[in-house]
Amino acid sequence: MVHSTLKRQTAPVRDIYYSVIIPAYNEEAFLPDTLAGLHLAMKAIPQKGEIIVVDNDSTDSTAEIARKAGARVVFEPFRQIARARNSGARAARSALLVFLDADTILPPALLNQALTLLASGTCCGGGTVLNFDAPLPFLAGRLIKFWNWISRTNRLAAGSFIFCLARAFHATGGFDEKTFAGEEIFLSRRISAWGKKQNLLFTILEKHPVITSSRKFHWYSSLQIALLLLLFSIFPFALRSRLLCRFWYTRPMK
C-alpha cells in the first residue's frame, strides 16, 4: 500500500497544458542552469506550461533563484524526495506532469517528445535513459550502462526525468512516502500497471537523454555506490531507512 500525503490535486487551469516539477534542496549551484535549459525547452512547446520548484527546506538561495526565474515556489519542510515531489504534484494546475531533478538539463526535443506521447492517447507516462555532464570513472560508467539497460528492458524511469498523466499519478497514489529513495521505481511499476488496464504504455525514451550531474560519482567511490545499490536490490525494505539512504541526503563538507 502506498503511503502518501497526496490527497488532492489543484483544479486544472484550462490554459496551463503541462507542469514541470523540480524538487530542490540547496541547489543554488545547479538550479540556474537547469531552469535556463528548461525555459529553452519550453519555448519550443506551443502550449503554455508552468514551472514548480519545491523548496525542500533549503538554507541557501534556491527559492530566490527559482522565483527570479519565473517559477512558482512551493515549500516542503520535511526533507524527503518523495514528499517534495508529491507537494509539487499537488500544486500542479495541469493534466500532464513532468518531474525533473534540479541538477538535470532537459533537451528541448525530449520535452516535446514526452508531451506529444502523453497527448497521443497511447501513453500514460515514462522516463528516459541517462547521460552525464562529465566523464565517469570506469566502474561508474558500467553501472550507468547497466541501469540504462534495466530501465529500457523493465520500463523503469530514473528520478532525473519522469513524465506522466496527472490522472495516472493521482490514481496510483503518487510517490510512496515510506521510502527515502527509489520511489521512482515503485511509481513506474504502479503507473505501468494502471496504464495496462487502460491500454496505455509506460515507455522509456532513448533518442534524447537528459544530461544530469555526475557529482555523486565524484563524492563517492564507484565501489561504494555499487555496494549500496546491491544492498537495496537484495533488501528493498532498506529504502525505508533515512540512515541507509543518506547517500541521497548528505553532501561532503565544502
PLM regions and their residue ranges:
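Short, well-formed alpha-helical segments that are part of the catalytic scaffolds
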Residues: 6-7, 27-42
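Cell-envelope/extracellular polymer assembly enzymes that use nucleotide-activated donors
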Residues: 17-19, 50, 186
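Short beta-strand/loop segment that forms part of the nucleotide-sugar
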Residues: 47-57, 74
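A conserved acidic beta->alpha catalytic loop
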Residues: 55-63, 104
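Glycine-rich, basic loop-to-helix element that forms the pyrophosphate-binding segment
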Residues: 76-92
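Short aromatic/hydrophobic "clamp" motif used to bind/position activated sugar donors
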Residues: 97
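Conserved donor NDP-sugar-binding/catalytic core segment of glycosyltransferases
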Residues: 108-138
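A short, conserved alpha-helix in the catalytic core of glycosyltransferases
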Residues: 168-172, 179-199, 203
